[in-house]
Swiss-Prot record:
This is Cytochrome b. The gene is MT-CYB. Heme 1 (or BL or b562) is low-potential and absorbs at about 562 nm, and heme 2 (or BH or b566) is high-potential and absorbs at about 566 nm. Coiled coil: none annotated. Its cofactor is heme b. Binds 2 heme b groups non-covalently. It comes from Microtus ilaeus. It is found in: Mitochondrion inner membrane. One of its GO terms (molecular function) is metal ion binding. The chain crosses the membrane at residues 33-53, 77-98, 113-133, 178-198, 226-246, 288-308, 320-340, 347-367. The cytochrome bc1 complex contains 11 subunits: 3 respiratory subunits (MT-CYB, CYC1 and UQCRFS1), 2 core proteins (UQCRC1 and UQCRC2) and 6 low-molecular weight proteins (UQCRH/QCR6, UQCRB/QCR7, UQCRQ/QCR8, UQCR10/QCR9, UQCR11/QCR10 and a cleavage product of UQCRFS1). This cytochrome bc1 complex then forms a dimer. Its main location: mitochondrion. Component of the ubiquinol-cytochrome c reductase complex (complex III or cytochrome b-c1 complex) that is part of the mitochondrial respiratory chain. The b-c1 complex mediates electron transfer from ubiquinol to cytochrome c. Contributes to the generation of a proton gradient across the mitochondrial membrane that is then used for ATP synthesis.
Length: 380
């Protein structure tokens, strides 16, 4: 068996990635989220495949086909709610995974980090298009508002929006192409994940100290396979509690009303995982400025290696930057809350303050804190 594992051209790739992979001996539970994201992706692809067997991407029947899945298909209600809440679990794991990367300075593995940012954009695009498919009120108006943002691009904006819509408004052509893209993107994401892992295995994993761990490596199997399995059990437990007891808690009641172009919902808002970016978008009165801020809120992650001023990699032994980091986390929670609130006083000013704070902490305060910590170290 050992000979096959190490010699077979296909199995040896799996062996070098998941079995004999040298891993740091001290990586904590924060390193479990990679495998959990892999699990989420598998769940989403499988449930999505079964949903696609019964779904029809036509404006006249899309809403009814989702109702048919929930009422008439064997365990269709379970598949539908697993897919909808699976997206939420996916984003929870994604945010924690990125947050771990920022905290422990994993962004210094530049290729892996940039691939991760591409993956984040791909997953966000997939989730957005998936939200349009049930063709409820929030699906329709969310698609209208978000795609309409592209009209802020000078000269070609309006033409670009109509090209994406396939007409002069969000309609049958839009729904059909969104379904096609929503179906193909997860497979593209799977390919990108393999590239992400390829880059990761070039350098090896980071660890909680931020120090080089080449002198102290252990095999991935059985130590981290069993550890990942515990994470999988906890995730599945939380996932099934969410899906079976509170299936609609993260959804919007407006999406149980069929799409109606003549009736605008009182508050148009995206799913909870986009609310922080939506709050940043809304906090700038200018349309183009808002769109740029929205894009920059994610793209700014790519600049983190350039903004790293400290002599140490991780925040483990850096209390000043740690404080900045947790203020940033709190700020993101505030932005998420604001994104779901109506555009009125005092929410507007809170959103604007939180948006400025978000960029200021990343671009100004965290690099400054790093330099101050360097000076404190030099005093010794």
């Amino acid at each position: 068996m050992t000979i096959i594992r190490k010699k077979h051209p296909l199995i040896k790739i799996i062996n070098h990635s998941f079995i004999d992979l040298p891993a740091p001996s001290n990586i904590s539970s924060w390193w479990n989220f990679g495998s959990l994201l892999g699990l989420c992706l598998i769940i989403q692809i499988l449930t999505g495949l079964f949903l696609a067997m019964h779904y029809t991407s036509d404006t006249a029947t899309a809403f009814s086909s989702v109702a048919h899945i929930c009422r008439d298909v064997n365990y269709g209600w379970l598949i539908r709610y697993m897919h909808a809440n699976g997206a939420s679990m996916f984003f929870i794991c994604l945010f924690l995974h990125v947050g771990r990367g920022v905290y422990y300075g994993s962004y210094n593995m530049i290729e892996t980090w940039n691939m991760g940012i591409v993956l984040l954009f791909a997953v966000m695009a997939t989730a957005f298009m998936g939200y349009v498919l049930p063709w409820g009120q929030m699906s329709f108006w969310g698609a209208t508002v978000i795609t309409n943002l592209l009209s802020a691009i000078p000269y070609i904006g309006t033409t670009l929006v109509e090209w994406i819509w396939g007409g002069f408004s969000v309609d049958k052509a839009t729904l059909t192409r969104f379904f096609a893209f929503h179906f193909i993107l997860p497979f593209i994401i799977t390919a990108l994940v393999l590239v992400h892992l390829l880059f990761l295995h070039e350098t090896g994993s980071n660890n909680p100290t931020g120090l080089n761990s080449d002198a102290d490596k252990i095999p991935f199997h059985p130590y981290y396979t069993i550890k990942d399995f515990l994470g999988v059990l906890i995730l599945l437990m939380a996932f099934m509690i969410l899906t079976l007891f509170f299936p609609d808690i993260l959804g919007d009641p407006d999406n149980y009303t069929p799409a109606n172009p003549l009736n605008t919902p009182p508050h148009i808002k995206p799913e909870w995982y986009f609310l922080f970016a939506y709050a940043i978008l809304r906090s700038i009165p200018n349309k183009l400025g808002g769109v740029l801020a929205l894009i920059l809120s994610i793209v700014i992650l790519a600049f983190m290696p350039l903004l790293h001023t400290s002599k140490q990699r991780a925040l483990t032994f850096r209390p000043i930057t740690q404080t900045m980091y947790w203020i940033l986390v709190a700020d993101l929670l505030i932005l998420t809350w604001i994104g779901g609130q109506p555009v009125e006083y005092p929410f507007i000013i809170i959103g604007q303050t939180a948006s400025i704070a978000y960029f200021a902490i990343i671009v100004i305060f965290m690099p400054m804190a790093g330099m101050i910590e360097n000076d404190i170290l030099d005093l010794d």
